[in-house]
UniProtKB/Swiss-Prot annotation:
Binding site for Zn(2+): 98, 100, 125, 127
Motif ('HIGH' region): 9-19
Protein name per UniProt: Glutamate--tRNA ligase
HAMAP family per record: Glu_tRNA_synth_type1
Enzyme class, first EC level, given as a word: ligase
Role: Catalyzes the attachment of glutamate to tRNA(Glu) in a two-step reaction: glutamate is first activated by ATP to form Glu-AMP and then transferred to the acceptor end of tRNA(Glu).
Originating organism: Erwinia tasmaniensis (strain DSM 17950 / CFBP 7177 / CIP 109463 / NCPPB 4357 / Et1/99)
Keywords for this protein: Aminoacyl-tRNA synthetase, ATP-binding, Cytoplasm, Ligase, Metal-binding, Nucleotide-binding, Protein biosynthesis, Zinc
Cross-referenced InterPro entries: aa-tRNA-synth_I_cd-bd, aa-tRNA-synth_I_codon-bd_sub2, aa-tRNA-synth_I_CS, aa_tRNA-synth_I_cd-bd_sf, Glu-tRNA-ligase_bac/mito, Glu/Gln-tRNA-synth, Glu/Gln-tRNA-synth_Ib_cat-dom, GluQ/Sye
Residues holding ATP: 240
Length: 469
């Protein structure tokens, strides 16, 4: 049997982390088994579905590199197909027309709730005894079995059973002629030959209804696997209140797709004590039978730890392609200064996100208007004038501009003045970066460049002169 999975988001908002994890699990399962992965846009909610949301979903999938073999399919383009099947079901008797008014159904619901009963349709139109005009408004309901049970073996949760007596006759076509979500899903999974439906646990209650429809139309029932929800650190369902955002917001916040994928795969799945997984390892190892049925808590610190790992372990040239976007957001002109791959090497250990890296790299490329006040007060004092003059001259005299040469120049200045390296290094750091902290001074000065470094030392000496006056 050829494995075929699908990711079927509703385009009513962004691709959130829960949806991204579901997409990842479906994608990994298909890839592990040499199967196919289908992208389907479930846009039957015409009032809430938007093109902007569709674009956001596509952007998120593409950024995560979750490629699909078929699709994207759109349910709104398949209404004729759904209605054809509904008409066949009406003909076969597995569906029927319901003429009950909204008022009657609301009264029925209120009475049932008042009596402590579960609200459900009472089947008044099920046997079709009443005569109605051909053009009288009606919905179409599925004739759900009234006896027996629906049992399915959830690949994550084990056997789950629902009594058919608990299920009412589901509306499958509204009065306006539009087929309903639960019905469209069934026909799509049938037509697209989906073998494994991997989705959130909020769909468990839909499953018995969908299975009954599949059996009624003679379709193969797929294997189901329902993934547990993601919680915030307070144990409540993850929401905007916890900072839960769309996948692309993580891009905007400076995370690499590899870090987010690694983090998401571990939210409910494990392979021993291993924490770091490459995409190839995920595809090779992922199986549904080890996915936890317990909810997982989202931990931003863990995600940052993974992101820091990938910033420093992936090829700097690759990381630089993602850093470029953040540099552009900071409006930094990088035409003069180090290559971005070199910048990744310089700042990688100090930065947890690419956004942080972009925000802290401007001094490599552009002049700063003033020194950090605290750093200048502490290190650009009159006593620093001579160390800066000596190291300036030695840097200016270098014919071969290398990081090792810069280190030797700083050491030579300290030796000449008979002071520790810090007496030269700290004023030099503030002079060339404008701040009191930076990566290793020799590689920093080297990356800034000879002419720019010497000019900044001159600027620092002028600043010191104003303090001496």
């Amino acid at each position: 049997m050829k494995i075929k999975t699908r990711f079927a988001p509703s385009p009513t908002g962004y691709l959130h982390v829960g949806g991204a994890r579901t997409a990842l699990y479906s994608w990994l399962f298909a890839r592990n088994h040499g199967g196919e992965f289908v992208l389907r846009i479930e846009d039957t909610d015409l009032e809430r579905s938007t093109q902007q949301a569709i674009d956001a979903i596509m952007d998120g999938m593409n950024w995560l590199n979750l490629d699909w073999d078929e699709g994207p399919y759109y349910q709104t383009k398949r209404f004729d197909r759904y209605n054809t099947v509904i008409d066949q079901m009406l003909e076969a008797g597995s569906a029927y027309k319901c003429y009950c008014s909204k008022e009657r159904l609301e009264t029925l619901r209120e009475n049932q709730m008042a009596n402590g009963e579960k609200p459900r349709y009472d089947g008044r139109c099920r046997d079709g005894h009443e005569h109605h005009a051909e053009n009288e408004p009606c919905v179409v309901r599925f004739r759900n079995p009234q006896e027996g049970s629906v049992i399915f073996d959830d690949q994550i949760r084990g056997p789950i059973e629902f009594s058919n007596q608990e299920l009412d006759d589901l509306i499958i076509r509204r009065t306006d002629g539009a087929p309903t979500y639960n019905f469209c899903v069934v026909i799509d999974d049938w037509d697209m030959e989906i073998t494994h439906v991997i989705r959130g646990e909020d769909h468990i209650n839909n499953t018995p209804r969908q299975i009954n429809i599949l059996k009624a139309i003679g379709a193969q029932v797929p294997v189901y696997a329902h993934v547990s929800m993601i919680l915030g650190d307070d144990g409540k369902k993850l929401s905007k209140r916890h900072g839960a955002v769309g996948v692309m917001q993580y891009r905007d916040d400076g995370y690499l797709p590899e870090a987010l994928l690694n983090y998401l795969v571990r939210l409910g799945w494990s392979h021993g004590d291993q924490e770091i997984f490459s995409i190839d390892e995920m595809k090779k190892l992922f199986e549904l039978d080890v996915v936890s049925k317990s909810a997982s808590a989202f931990n931003t610190e863990k995600l940052q730890w993974l992101n820091h790992h990938y910033i420093n372990s992936l090829a700097p040239e690759y990381v630089a392609t993602h850093l470029q976007w953040h540099i552009e957001q900071e409006n930094i002109d990088t035409r003069t200064g180090p290559q971005l791959a070199q910048l990744v090497k310089l700042l990688g250990e100090r930065c947890k996100t690419l956004k942080e890296m972009a925000a802290s790299c401007r001094y490599f490329y552009e002049e700063f208007d003033e020194f950090d006040a605290d750093a200048a007060k502490k290190h650009l004092r009159p006593v620093a004038r001579q160390p800066l003059e000596v190291v300036r001259d030695k840097l200016a005299a270098m014919s071969d501009w290398t990081a090792e040469g810069v280190h030797q120049a700083i050491q030579a200045a300290a030796d000449e003045l008979e002071v520790g390296m810090g007496k030269v290094g700290m004023p030099l750091r503030v002079a060339v970066t404008g701040a009191g902290q930076s990566p290793a001074l020799d590689v920093t000065v080297h990356a800034i460049g000879q002419a720019r470094s010497v000019a900044r030392i001159e600027k620092a000496l002028a600043y010191i002169a104003t303090r001496e006056a």
